[in-house]
Regions:
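Hydrophobic helical h-region of N-terminal Sec-dependent signal peptides
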Residues: 16-21
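C-terminal motif of bacterial Sec signal peptides marking the signal peptidase cleavage site
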Residues: 23-26
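C-terminal partner/receptor-binding element of secreted or periplasmic proteins
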Residues: 130-170
Length: 170
């Protein structure tokens, strides 16, 4: 059987196109995961809100308070997601129930003990007219570099319990 030049031309022109269409047609939009609140890649947009539902104390000599499994804790179990609310001034003090605007949010990693342990964290920089000393909320956990994942909203909600809630900007 003899393949003509025209058949070869059609084959080499349309087969790559067909392969690209076949491969990409089943793939979801990669930007959709940034809009899915259940995705670990969810993008917290500026203008979102973090609502503190109860007053929390800042211990003496510290500039933060910690939350894990829906409770205020004195220290974090680093291998479970926990969050730290940072303030400008050393305690004793308190942060009163309020709504904070999230000015910027980012996710990142940093080495704790190379090559075995990394810190995976998400930080939200906060703003409040009534409490300008409240700086940020950082949610984090430690894991192996190949096993760890970005901190998801559902993990943050579990760590914060009913103490905080989120309202995400569209």
């Amino acid at each position: 059987m003899h393949v003509t030049a025209m058949t070869r031309s059609i084959f080499f022109r349309w087969v790559p196109v067909a392969l690209v269409v076949a491969v990409t047609s089943g793939c979801p939009n990669p930007m959709a995961v940034k809009d899915d609140v259940d995705s670990q890649f969810f993008y917290i947009r500026p203008g979102s809100q973090l609502i503190l539902h109860q007053d929390v104390s800042i211990p003496s000599g510290r500039s933060h308070t910690s939350f894990q499994h829906g409770q205020v804790v004195s220290g974090l179990d680093n291998y479970a997601v926990g969050c730290v609310l940072d303030v400008r001034d050393l305690g004793p003090g308190s942060v009163t129930a309020a709504t904070f605007t999230i000015k910027r949010a980012e996710s990142s990693t940093e080495w704790i003990s190379r090559p075995n342990i990394m810190k995976f964290y998400r930080v939200m920089y906060l703003q409040s007219e009534s409490q300008p000393g409240v700086l940020r909320l950082t949610c984090q956990d430690w894991d192996g570099p190949l096993m760890g994942e970005d901190i998801s909203v559902s993990e943050m909600r579990e760590a914060l319990g009913g103490i905080f809630s989120f309202v995400f900007a569209p």
